[in-house]
């Protein structure tokens, strides 16, 4: 991972074989980012989508492996139990122009991933909502 800071914005480039969520969490801990949002694009070789079922309060997942373009990656950064928390969604497309989308569980970079991350001043917290089973923003 390489990055550059311009005012309150970080321009991040993830490298081949790096995991998106893992690297973003490491980055936020290192830079002490407790609130923010990001968007990006690039290419992945593996991706795990997650979908939350409100009735069962459980996630199901779907994994893809191959060559996929990230056509949209966006999410936010908050803190839960004193640790960085990433909530991200992703859309990927294949060579036949099919696309898949959902909550991002994890993704492995195949070529590059270019992310613009905007740091907010202050802390945004999350807490578990017993009614839905989700970790919601505590605002």
Roles of regions detected by a PLM:
Residues 1-87, 91-139:
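N-terminal intrinsically disordered, cationic/polar leader segments
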